[in-house]
Amino acid sequence: MVFGLLKDIKNGEYRTIATPVEITTIVNDGHTALVQRGAGEKAGFADSAYEAAGAKLVDTMEEIYAQADFVTKVKELEPCEFPLLRKGQIIFTCIHPAAHPQKVQAILDSGCIAFTAEDSHRYGSPNCEAAGKQGALMGLESMLSINGGKGMFVSGLGGSPAMKVLILGGGTVGQAALSVLYALGARVTVMDINIGILRTLKRQYNEHIDTMMCTKENIAALLPQTDMVLNCVKWPKGCNDWLIDRPMLKLMGKGSVIVDISNDDNGA
């Protein structure tokens, strides 16, 4: 099989879906690896490292699409790539089909075989862990008074209480956010619909966090005392309900922060 690694062209995307380590494995398994020049540069992997791993460097994405049986990159396809798709060719990339119906149609029209990278991680994508931790830090930055927040210190100070944080969703994203906020001294409540997850987290943190079943009623009861909410729920596609609706936002105090890490279309 000919494996093709594309350089991501979406504005602001610096990741690569395959490092030289993965290329070494692919080549050692007897496959041919084509890598577009600069595919890993912004992620810290030089073209020379891919060559040393056994890859052949090519200049354009057109060459990758024309020669490769398996084509991969991080982010969804751009319109300029639609005409390059071939019947029977395997595409592995983020697609986010609910948000990009025109891209789904282009894939169907081409006859290629496409896998949604965002849904392929059995134990949760490393990106989920990174998003949870980074989301927690961005929330704390937004809490600064210079950014319009309450100006609270996350762990509190002598005579001043710690920040109260509500995490919606106890999966990979929520657990990553929890690890950061708990370590910094926030008073955290985690909500989920899975009682098993809540029990596990309660034991993991030696009963030093609060857990509740995730319902609109429970959320509404906590919002008036909550300084920051992190949405880590993967919302069902096509769902027309919300965990937090517009009237519920009025329950939160001025300067409170919401970090929508999941950021699904018509999300929670």
Predicted regions and their residues:
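Short, well-ordered alpha-helix to beta-strand connector turns
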Residues: 30, 54, 67-68, 88-89, ...
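Rossmann-like adenosine-cofactor binding region
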Residues: 207-268
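Glycine-rich phosphate/diphosphate-binding loop of Rossmann-like nucleotide-binding domains
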Residues: 7, 11-42, 148-231
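Short, ordered loop/turn segments at secondary-structure junctions
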Residues: 8-10, 38-40, 76, 96-97, ...
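Glycine/serine-rich phosphate-binding loop and adjoining beta1-alpha1 elements at the start
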Residues: 2, 8-10, 79-163
